[in-house]
Amino acid sequence: MLTGRKKAYLYEEHYDDVSGYSNPNESVHDHFTVGHTSTSVSLACGLAKARDLKGEEGNVIAVIGDGSLSGGEALEGLDYAAELGGNLIIVVNDNDMSIAENHGGLYKNLKFLRDTEGKADCNFFKSMGLDYVFVKDGNDIDALTFAFESVKDSKKPVVVHIVTEKGKGFALAE
């Protein structure tokens, strides 16, 4: 909805107007054609580096779901983001869902962070050198606005970990 695809989600006759993935032919906000979000953090690192080399300003934002975090490219992107420095916002959409069952140390840490409302001493993102903000209700627009206002001028990469409920507000999906 934030990238100009609102009609496709609100009106049945427009459902087929979008691919469901990043596509520059669908939105000026998409810079790459990709099929999975494990690539989002690495691609955002490249955009942030280019912005910095050109002496430009502005936010670069990567969005990645919890189900995509275990992808090798996602982990490489997080590692590089910590070294890159500069403004980079990494939104982790944690709805505790993925195509396959979430398991392993990373998902245990995400659960621990959810259970402690982001206050766990053992924080995967902080241990990598990234700043971290937790949003308990990622379906709450006011909470999201507050979180993004707090990080928009960050001078180093920050993870905004939002816990969402997939389909919230739409009875058939809840």
Task: Locate the predicted segments by residue.
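Structural motif
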Residues: 42, 59-62, 87-91, 131-133, ...
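Generic secondary-structure signature for well-ordered alpha-helical cores
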Residues: 16-17, 49-53, 83-86, 97, ...
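Short, glycine-/Ser/Thr-/acidic-enriched flexible segments
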Residues: 26-28, 48, 67-69, 95-97, ...
